[in-house]
Amino acid sequence: NEAQMKTEVGKPIQQVNPALYSGISQQADNIARELKSKNVNVQRLNPEVLDAAEMQYLKYVQQGNNFLFPKNSFVVIGNNVIECATRAPMNDKNRFIVRRILKPLTKEDPSIRYIAAPIPSPSFPDKTLYIEGNDILVDGTNVYVGHSGKGTSSSGVRWLQSVLGSNYKVYSIDIAGYRHLD
């Protein structure tokens, strides 16, 4: 919860809430195991690949790390790999790991477009462009983007439509009271 995040700032979730961490980790492990059983190549975030500068990235704005929910930091829509711009600066460290996984794929297939959303201002202005992967659900050429005021911003929805072009229709879905669409 938000109050606990403020009092325990910078501490690993394993220390602050071991039961929650264990449950999330177990769920991720189960999903990975199931996908591997279906011959899906599963890539997991490994924070150990980050160098010291990457680990310290934006620490002066928000302490901590969040390597449990990598989908919030990027999304794949068709042949578009999109680095997101999240409201929580600590999530931006994920992009360094994801780049190491996805960038080589763009070299293998020139039809893949690798796009990075503009990085938000560290002063958190209301009109900043935020786009979060956990707010995005794709159904063919229809892209649904949750808008709660806690994640993706209206300007993020507009930016996504401009990046995807006329081949996709982006719908903004009001999800007040929820954190993310998925």
In which residue ranges do the predicted regions lie?
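The feature marks the mature, well-folded catalytic cores of soluble enzymes
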Residues: N1-D182
